[in-house]
Curated annotation (Swiss-Prot):
Name of the protein in question: Large ribosomal subunit protein uL13
PROSITE patterns in UniProt: RIBOSOMAL_L13 (PS00783)
Annotated Gene Ontology cellular component terms: cytosolic large ribosomal subunit
Keyword Ribonucleoprotein tagged: yes
Amino acid sequence: MKTFTAKPSNIKREWLLIDATDKTLGRLATEVAMILRGKNKPEYTPHMDTGDYVVIVNAEKIAVTGNKRKAKTYYHHTGYIGGIKSVSFEKLIATHPERAIEKAVRGMLPRTPLGRTMFKKLKVYAGEAHPHTAQQPKAHNI
């Protein structure tokens, strides 16, 4: 039996619309990462981008369990000496609601050029409105 490899011409990409209202952050992120990688398709090939486009709306209404809304902290470094910066989940959602979902999904994708290509297919919006109506995204339930 031969190993199956998807051909770029045979890869069919869909646009999926996911509503993040009252969804748990980590559980939503794992599902989205699987869709972006294409692992939900029978023609999944590890060295190719076979995933679909994902549009997430209502990112500001994402849920976290326990005390994480106040206690969860995101860190980044500016590159300067002593340049470590931190922001709580609560402040991040208040200022840039889409970044919490983007960071969670990005951490679940490969840290390679292929992973960066997969991440570009993720579109996250704070509210209900999104500019991808022309692509006719299908509602996807998680």
